[in-house]
C-alpha cells in the first residue's frame, strides 16, 4: 500500500514535468559510480552537485542500451529519474547542513565584533573585558576630578587663612579686642570668626554705600537703582545671618558688643540698633513724604516700639529668673553638692532662652528694614540706606578719634588734685560746654 501511494505520488509529479530524453540506463543503479565521495562536492551548493551528478551519469550511459518500444520501461526510467533527483536534493541538503557550522561561526564572529572592540595589537576583546575597561576609565576620571576639587579646596582654604590673618592684624590695629578680650585666644572660635566676618562686612558695606551714592548722583533709572538697593538689602540680610550663627554658638559675645566700636556700644539695644530710633532718625531725612507714606512710617515706628517694649520686659524677667536660680539656696561654703548641681542645671535651662530673645530682636530689625522698603520708593530707600551707613560710619570715626587722642596731659596731671578754685573753674567750663543740651 505504501509503495502504491509512493508510485501514485511520483506519477503525479511526473505528470507535471515536461517530456525528457530517454537517456537513462536499464541496468541497476548499484553499478553507477557515486561522485559524492569527493570532499569538495560536499562544500558545493545543491545546484552544482546536481549538475555534476547528471553529467557523470550522462557519460556512463550508452545510447545502445536504451529501449523505447516498451511503456513499462519508460515508466521505470521516469521513476528512476525521480529517485536520482531526490538523491541529488538530499545530497545538496547534506552539504548545506555541513556548511552551517562555518556560517554560524562567521555570525558569532560578527556578534563578537559587534559587542567587543579591538585593541591596538589587533586582538579582539569580548564585551565583559570592554565593560571592565570602561569602568576602570570612569573610576580614574572620577578620581582625577576628586583630586582636582581637593586641590582647589586647599587653595581656597589657604587664601581664606591669609585673609583671616590680615583681618586679625587690622582688628588689633583698630583696637577691636579691648578689656578682657585682648587676644583672640581668649574667645571662642565662633566669636573670632564673627569678628572677622563683621570686619569684612564693614568693608563691603563701604563699597556698597559708595556705589549707591554714585548711582544717586548719576540719576540712574529706577530699574538700575533698584538692583543696587536690593543688593544693599541682601547685604544686611547677610549680617543678620552672621549674627544668628553667633547667637547659636556664643550668645554672650553677641550681647556684650565687643565686636563693635566703643562709641557704637553706647547706642546698642540688645546687641544692635533700636528700630524705632532708626525710624525716628530717618523720617526727617526723607522729606517730602506723601501722607500715606508718613502714616506708614509712623505706624511702623509705633509697632516697633511696642515690640521693643515686649522684648525688654521678657528679657528683664529672664534676668530675674536667672538670678533667682543662681542665688537660690544657701550660699555658704558648706552647700550641698546635690543642691548646687540642681541649681546649676536650672540656671542652664533658663539661660538657653537668652538666645531666642536676641534672635527675636534681630528679626525685628530685619522686618523693619524690609517693611520700610515696601513703604518707600526706590530712591527714598536708597537715601535711607545711605543715612544708616553714614550714621554708623560717624560712630566708628568717633571711636577712632577717641582712641587716638593725646594722653600726655592726662598722664602728667593724673596725680595732681585740683584746688577749690580750680574745681570751680572746671565746673563752670563743664556748664558752658553742656549748656546747649
Curated annotation (Swiss-Prot):
PROSITE patterns membership: BZIP (PS50217), BZIP_BASIC (PS00036), DOG1 (PS51806)
Annotated TM spans: none
Localization terms from the record: Nucleus
Entry's Gene Ontology cellular component terms: nucleus
Domain (DOG1): residue spans on this chain: 191-405
A Pfam short name: DOG1
Biased composition (Low complexity): 37-50
Region annotated Leucine-zipper, chain positions: 154-168
Region (Disordered): 33-75
Biological function: Transcriptional regulator involved in defense response.
Assembly, per entry: Interacts with NPR5/NH4, NH5.1 and NH5.2.
Protein name in UniProt: Transcription factor TGAL5
Organism listed in the record: Oryza sativa subsp. japonica
Lineage of producing organism: Eukaryota, Viridiplantae, Streptophyta, Embryophyta, Tracheophyta
